[in-house]
Protein backbone atom coordinates (compact mmCIF):
# COMPACT_ATOMS: atom_id res chain seq x y z
CA UNK A 1 0.00 0.00 0.00
CA UNK A 2 1.30 3.43 -0.89
CA UNK A 3 0.43 6.42 1.24
CA UNK A 4 2.26 8.87 -1.00
CA UNK A 5 0.31 11.93 -2.08
CA UNK A 6 0.92 14.35 -4.95
CA UNK A 7 0.27 17.51 -2.93
CA UNK A 8 3.17 19.81 -2.16
CA UNK A 9 4.43 19.28 1.41
CA UNK A 10 3.56 21.82 4.08
CA UNK A 11 6.76 23.50 5.26
CA UNK A 12 7.63 25.85 8.10
CA UNK A 13 7.83 28.63 5.51
CA UNK A 14 4.32 27.81 4.29
CA UNK A 15 2.95 27.87 7.85
CA UNK A 16 4.47 31.32 8.31
CA UNK A 17 2.89 32.44 5.05
CA UNK A 18 -0.49 31.09 6.14
CA UNK A 19 -0.23 33.05 9.38
CA UNK A 20 0.72 36.25 7.56
CA UNK A 21 -2.13 35.90 5.06
CA UNK A 22 -4.73 35.02 7.68
CA UNK A 23 -5.28 31.47 6.40
CA UNK A 24 -6.13 29.19 9.31
CA UNK A 25 -3.86 26.26 10.18
CA UNK A 26 -5.64 22.93 10.84
CA UNK A 27 -3.76 20.63 13.21
CA UNK A 28 -4.75 17.29 14.77
CA UNK A 29 -2.88 14.81 16.92
CA UNK A 30 -1.82 11.61 15.20
CA UNK A 31 -0.03 8.51 16.42
CA UNK A 32 0.06 5.94 13.57
CA UNK A 33 0.48 5.50 9.83
CA UNK A 34 -3.14 4.69 8.97
CA UNK A 35 -4.56 7.78 10.62
CA UNK A 36 -1.69 9.87 9.22
CA UNK A 37 -2.81 8.90 5.71
CA UNK A 38 -6.46 9.59 6.55
CA UNK A 39 -5.72 13.02 8.00
CA UNK A 40 -3.51 13.88 5.04
CA UNK A 41 -6.12 13.06 2.41
CA UNK A 42 -8.64 15.25 4.22
CA UNK A 43 -6.47 18.35 4.26
CA UNK A 44 -4.95 18.50 7.75
CA UNK A 45 -1.95 20.83 7.61
CA UNK A 46 -0.03 19.73 10.71
CA UNK A 47 0.15 16.36 12.45
CA UNK A 48 1.05 16.58 16.13
CA UNK A 49 2.56 13.40 17.51
CA UNK A 50 1.35 14.26 20.97
CA UNK A 51 2.32 12.90 24.35
CA UNK A 52 -1.46 12.73 24.73
CA UNK A 53 -0.87 9.20 23.45
CA UNK A 54 -0.29 8.42 27.10
CA UNK A 55 -3.96 9.17 27.74
CA UNK A 56 -5.70 7.97 24.60
CA UNK A 57 -3.52 5.00 23.61
CA UNK A 58 -1.96 3.82 26.87
CA UNK A 59 -4.77 4.66 29.30
CA UNK A 60 -2.53 6.73 31.57
CA UNK A 61 -4.06 9.34 33.89
CA UNK A 62 -1.62 11.97 32.59
CA UNK A 63 1.07 12.46 29.96
CA UNK A 64 3.87 12.18 32.51
CA UNK A 65 4.76 8.47 32.05
CA UNK A 66 5.35 8.80 28.28
CA UNK A 67 8.97 8.17 27.27
CA UNK A 68 11.25 9.61 24.60
CA UNK A 69 11.52 6.27 22.81
CA UNK A 70 7.74 5.96 22.68
CA UNK A 71 7.54 9.42 21.11
CA UNK A 72 10.22 8.49 18.58
CA UNK A 73 8.42 5.24 17.70
CA UNK A 74 5.08 6.95 17.07
CA UNK A 75 6.80 9.70 15.09
CA UNK A 76 8.31 7.07 12.81
CA UNK A 77 4.85 5.52 12.32
CA UNK A 78 3.24 8.86 11.44
CA UNK A 79 6.01 9.85 9.03
CA UNK A 80 5.67 6.55 7.17
CA UNK A 81 1.98 7.22 6.62
CA UNK A 82 2.12 10.80 5.38
CA UNK A 83 4.05 13.07 3.04
CA UNK A 84 2.19 16.40 2.83
CA UNK A 85 1.46 17.50 6.45
CA UNK A 86 4.10 19.13 8.63
CA UNK A 87 4.99 16.81 11.54
CA UNK A 88 5.49 18.16 15.06
CA UNK A 89 6.46 15.89 17.97
CA UNK A 90 6.03 16.53 21.67
CA UNK A 91 9.10 16.31 23.85
CA UNK A 92 7.95 14.22 26.83
CA UNK A 93 8.23 15.19 30.46
CA UNK A 94 11.80 15.05 31.75
CA UNK A 95 13.41 15.10 28.31
CA UNK A 96 14.17 18.84 28.08
CA UNK A 97 13.67 20.59 31.43
CA UNK A 98 17.14 19.85 32.85
CA UNK A 99 19.21 21.94 30.44
CA UNK A 100 19.36 23.22 26.85
CA UNK A 101 21.97 20.55 26.15
CA UNK A 102 19.64 17.79 27.35
CA UNK A 103 16.88 19.25 25.20
CA UNK A 104 19.13 19.32 22.13
CA UNK A 105 20.25 15.74 22.62
CA UNK A 106 16.68 14.46 22.88
CA UNK A 107 15.30 16.74 20.17
CA UNK A 108 17.92 15.27 17.83
CA UNK A 109 16.50 11.80 18.53
CA UNK A 110 13.01 12.96 17.55
CA UNK A 111 14.25 14.77 14.46
CA UNK A 112 16.08 11.62 13.40
CA UNK A 113 12.77 9.77 13.76
CA UNK A 114 11.22 12.17 11.26
CA UNK A 115 9.88 15.11 13.27
CA UNK A 116 10.14 18.46 11.50
CA UNK A 117 9.62 20.43 14.71
CA UNK A 118 9.56 19.64 18.43
CA UNK A 119 7.07 20.98 20.94
CA UNK A 120 7.90 21.81 24.53
CA UNK A 121 5.86 23.25 27.35
CA UNK A 122 6.63 26.31 29.45
CA UNK A 123 6.76 30.09 29.37
CA UNK A 124 9.57 32.64 29.44
CA UNK A 125 11.73 30.38 31.60
CA UNK A 126 12.06 28.05 28.58
CA UNK A 127 13.25 30.84 26.25
CA UNK A 128 16.93 29.97 26.71
CA UNK A 129 16.24 26.37 25.71
CA UNK A 130 14.13 27.43 22.73
CA UNK A 131 16.89 29.74 21.50
CA UNK A 132 19.52 27.01 21.98
CA UNK A 133 17.50 24.57 19.85
CA UNK A 134 16.59 27.04 17.10
CA UNK A 135 20.18 28.23 16.74
CA UNK A 136 21.16 24.61 16.15
CA UNK A 137 18.59 23.92 13.47
CA UNK A 138 15.69 22.52 15.49
CA UNK A 139 12.36 24.31 14.85
CA UNK A 140 10.32 24.75 18.03
CA UNK A 141 6.63 24.93 18.86
CA UNK A 142 6.05 26.38 22.32
CA UNK A 143 3.05 25.56 24.56
CA UNK A 144 1.62 27.87 27.22
CA UNK A 145 -1.60 28.24 29.19
CA UNK A 146 -2.72 24.88 30.51
CA UNK A 147 0.44 22.78 30.23
CA UNK A 148 -0.50 19.12 30.86
CA UNK A 149 3.00 18.10 31.99
CA UNK A 150 2.60 20.57 34.88
CA UNK A 151 -0.92 19.44 35.79
CA UNK A 152 -0.04 18.66 39.41
CA UNK A 153 1.62 22.03 39.94
CA UNK A 154 -1.34 23.81 38.33
CA UNK A 155 -3.81 21.98 40.57
CA UNK A 156 -5.62 20.17 37.78
CA UNK A 157 -6.92 20.94 34.31
CA UNK A 158 -7.98 24.56 34.79
CA UNK A 159 -8.36 27.59 32.54
CA UNK A 160 -5.25 29.77 32.70
CA UNK A 161 -5.01 33.56 32.36
CA UNK A 162 -8.40 34.52 33.77
CA UNK A 163 -6.97 37.23 36.03
CA UNK A 164 -5.39 40.43 34.75
CA UNK A 165 -2.06 39.32 36.19
CA UNK A 166 -2.36 35.86 34.65
CA UNK A 167 -3.23 37.27 31.24
CA UNK A 168 -0.27 39.65 31.35
CA UNK A 169 2.04 36.79 32.29
CA UNK A 170 0.85 34.66 29.35
CA UNK A 171 1.39 37.56 26.95
CA UNK A 172 4.89 38.13 28.32
CA UNK A 173 5.60 34.40 27.95
CA UNK A 174 4.46 34.42 24.33
CA UNK A 175 6.57 37.45 23.46
CA UNK A 176 9.65 35.95 25.13
CA UNK A 177 9.21 32.66 23.28
CA UNK A 178 8.75 34.46 19.96
CA UNK A 179 11.91 36.48 20.57
CA UNK A 180 13.75 33.24 21.34
CA UNK A 181 12.78 31.89 17.92
CA UNK A 182 9.73 29.68 18.43
CA UNK A 183 7.69 29.55 15.21
CA UNK A 184 4.45 28.23 16.69
CA UNK A 185 2.84 28.36 20.11
CA UNK A 186 -0.05 26.27 21.39
CA UNK A 187 -2.42 28.24 23.63
CA UNK A 188 -4.40 25.76 25.74
CA UNK A 189 -7.45 26.59 27.86
CA UNK A 190 -6.96 30.34 27.69
CA UNK A 191 -9.85 32.86 27.62
CA UNK A 192 -10.67 33.77 24.02
CA UNK A 193 -10.07 37.49 24.60
CA UNK A 194 -6.64 36.82 26.09
CA UNK A 195 -5.64 34.50 23.22
CA UNK A 196 -6.86 37.09 20.71
CA UNK A 197 -4.74 39.79 22.35
CA UNK A 198 -1.69 37.52 22.35
CA UNK A 199 -2.20 36.63 18.68
CA UNK A 200 -2.41 40.30 17.69
CA UNK A 201 0.70 41.17 19.72
CA UNK A 202 2.96 38.69 17.92
CA UNK A 203 4.98 39.55 14.82
CA UNK A 204 5.97 36.16 13.43
CA UNK A 205 4.88 33.33 15.73
CA UNK A 206 1.62 31.57 14.82
CA UNK A 207 -0.81 30.73 17.62
CA UNK A 208 -2.56 27.35 17.66
CA UNK A 209 -5.57 27.28 19.94
CA UNK A 210 -7.13 24.46 21.91
CA UNK A 211 -9.84 25.98 24.03
CA UNK A 212 -8.47 29.44 23.22
CA UNK A 213 -11.05 31.01 20.92
CA UNK A 214 -11.40 31.48 17.18
CA UNK A 215 -8.91 34.32 16.68
CA UNK A 216 -5.81 32.11 16.87
CA UNK A 217 -3.80 31.43 13.71
CA UNK A 218 -5.01 27.83 13.79
CA UNK A 219 -6.62 25.13 15.89
CA UNK A 220 -5.69 21.72 17.27
CA UNK A 221 -7.68 18.94 18.91
CA UNK A 222 -6.80 15.48 20.12
CA UNK A 223 -7.91 13.16 17.32
CA UNK A 224 -9.77 10.82 19.65
CA UNK A 225 -11.72 13.74 21.13
CA UNK A 226 -12.60 15.06 17.67
CA UNK A 227 -14.12 11.72 16.61
CA UNK A 228 -15.86 11.10 19.93
CA UNK A 229 -13.55 8.40 21.26
CA UNK A 230 -12.83 9.72 24.72
CA UNK A 231 -13.41 8.34 28.21
CA UNK A 232 -15.43 10.28 30.75
CA UNK A 233 -16.62 13.85 30.48
CA UNK A 234 -16.02 15.80 27.27
CA UNK A 235 -14.01 19.00 27.69
CA UNK A 236 -15.83 22.23 26.84
CA UNK A 237 -13.48 23.02 23.96
CA UNK A 238 -14.10 19.68 22.22
CA UNK A 239 -16.57 19.21 19.38
CA UNK A 240 -17.44 15.68 18.29
CA UNK A 241 -17.29 15.95 14.50
CA UNK A 242 -18.47 12.34 14.12
CA UNK A 243 -21.98 13.43 15.07
CA UNK A 244 -23.86 13.47 11.78
CA UNK A 245 -20.83 12.35 9.77
CA UNK A 246 -21.00 9.26 7.57
CA UNK A 247 -17.36 8.31 8.16
CA UNK A 248 -14.17 9.34 9.93
CA UNK A 249 -13.00 10.82 6.64
CA UNK A 250 -16.10 13.02 6.56
CA UNK A 251 -15.62 14.04 10.19
CA UNK A 252 -12.00 15.08 9.61
CA UNK A 253 -12.94 16.96 6.44
CA UNK A 254 -15.66 18.78 8.41
CA UNK A 255 -13.15 19.70 11.13
CA UNK A 256 -10.70 21.09 8.59
CA UNK A 257 -13.44 23.08 6.85
CA UNK A 258 -14.70 24.48 10.17
CA UNK A 259 -11.20 25.57 11.20
CA UNK A 260 -10.53 27.12 7.81
CA UNK A 261 -13.76 29.13 7.71
CA UNK A 262 -13.53 30.15 11.36
CA UNK A 263 -16.76 28.45 12.47
CA UNK A 264 -14.84 26.26 14.93
CA UNK A 265 -14.43 26.93 17.73
CA UNK A 266 -17.87 28.45 18.31
CA UNK A 267 -18.81 30.40 21.43
CA UNK A 268 -19.83 27.26 23.32
CA UNK A 269 -16.29 25.86 22.93
CA UNK A 270 -14.58 28.95 24.40
CA UNK A 271 -13.82 30.38 27.83
From Swiss-Prot:
The active site is at 188 (proton acceptor). Pathway: Cofactor biosynthesis; (R)-pantothenate biosynthesis; (R)-pantoate from 3-methyl-2-oxobutanoate: step 1/2. Gene3D superfamilies: Phosphoenolpyruvate-binding domains (3.20.20.60). It is found in: Cytoplasm. One of its GO terms (molecular function) is magnesium ion binding. It catalyses: 3-methyl-2-oxobutanoate + (6R)-5,10-methylene-5,6,7,8-tetrahydrofolate + H2O = 2-dehydropantoate + (6S)-5,6,7,8-tetrahydrofolate. 3-methyl-2-oxobutanoate binds at residues 51-52, 90, 119. It comes from the Bacteria. Mg(2+) binds at residues 51, 90, 121. Keywords: Cytoplasm, Magnesium, Metal-binding, Pantothenate biosynthesis, Transferase. Belongs to the PanB family. Catalyzes the reversible reaction in which hydroxymethyl group from 5,10-methylenetetrahydrofolate is transferred onto alpha-ketoisovalerate to form ketopantoate. This is 3-methyl-2-oxobutanoate hydroxymethyltransferase.
